[in-house]
Amino acid sequence: MTAQGNKPSSHDVITGRWTPSAADRAAGRVSGFGVITNIINGGLDC
């Protein structure tokens, strides 16, 4: 639940504390399940 590198905290995304930057929006990253899926990527996170 802690931000790691260039990934925001999944808790912050879920609770609405994270807001996408202009670069995030340009890359298609907006608040919601899709961003959570990208944060929890099955690597060391799982």
From Swiss-Prot:
Q: Which domain of life is it from?
A: Eukaryota
- The EC number on file is 3.2.1.14
The GO biological-process annotations, alphabetized, read as: cell wall macromolecule catabolic process; chitin catabolic process; defense response; polysaccharide catabolic process
Disulfide bonds, paired cysteine numbers: none
Record carries keyword Mitochondrion: no
Q: Which reaction does it catalyse?
A: Random endo-hydrolysis of N-acetyl-beta-D-glucosaminide (1->4)-beta-linkages in chitin and chitodextrins
> Which conditions up-regulate this protein?
By yeast extract and dilution. Slight induction by glucan elicitor.
A single GO molecular function term of this UniProt record: endochitinase activity
Keyword vocabulary terms for this entry: Carbohydrate metabolism, Chitin degradation, Chitin-binding, Glycosidase, Hydrolase, Plant defense, Polysaccharide degradation
Relate the protein's function as given in its record: Defense against chitin-containing fungal and bacterial pathogens.
The family note in this entry says: Belongs to the glycosyl hydrolase 19 family. Chitinase class I subfamily.
* Name used for this protein in its record: Endochitinase 1A
Its source organism is Arachis hypogaea
